[in-house]
């Protein structure tokens, strides 16, 4: 499969927003041709220290390259990342991905920080910097008119239905081309 035939749905959001949970639950649905990946679970070798936005772009490029070269049977990859929406758009355009969508998974700060403390045992990520990152991502998503899945008050199942609808719409566009 070449890049022009691969559909990419980038899920972005701050730590604790619910991206990984949604990606794992989506995989449990076993939708033919669709697979979710936690992109941060790959180590990118770099000769120089990159800024975090460059590292996230490198990670996104790695997954696009990996998925487009292998015979995986994947038509649509859902990539769980923390890349900024603007940077994700740049990378997707540079890589000539014809079918792409960026979706923000968002959550109010109190709930996100509660998840980081209680559910994930990562209290070090519940900080002002992560709150600012979440606000920045929300601002970009709003400015770019992106779909937003707000997990603040919705059950995982309801948020998963929202994601499944977005995946279905993108998959339909790919298959009808």
Q: Which residues make up each language-model segment?
A:
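Walker A/P-loop
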Residues: 20
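Glycine-rich phosphate-binding loop used to anchor ATP phosphates in small-molecule kinases
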Residues: 55-99
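Conserved phosphate-donor/acceptor-positioning beta-strand/loop module used by diverse small-molecule
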Residues: 97-117
């Amino acid at each position: 499969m070449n890049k022009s035939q691969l559909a990419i749905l980038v899920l972005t959001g701050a730590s604790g927003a619910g991206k990984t949970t949604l990606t794992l639950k989506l995989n449990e649905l076993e939708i033919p041709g669709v697979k979710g990946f936690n992109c941060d679970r790959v180590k990118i070798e770099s000769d120089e220290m990159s800024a975090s936005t460059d590292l996230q772009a490198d990670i996104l490029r790695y997954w696009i390259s990996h998925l487009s070269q292998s015979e995986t049977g994947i038509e649509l990859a859902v990539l769980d990342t923390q890349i900024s929406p603007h940077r994700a758009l740049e990378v997707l355009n540079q890589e000539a991905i014809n079918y792409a969508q960026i979706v923000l998974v968002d959550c109010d700060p109190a709930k996100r920080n509660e998840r980081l403390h209680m559910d994930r045992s990562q209290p070090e990520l519940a900080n002002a910097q992560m709150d600012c990152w979440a606000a920045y991502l929300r601002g970009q998503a709003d400015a770019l008119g992106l779909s937003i899945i707000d997990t603040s008050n919705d059950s995982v199942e309801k948020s998963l239905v929202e994601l499944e609808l977005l995946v279905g719409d993108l998959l339909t566009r790919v298959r009808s081309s």
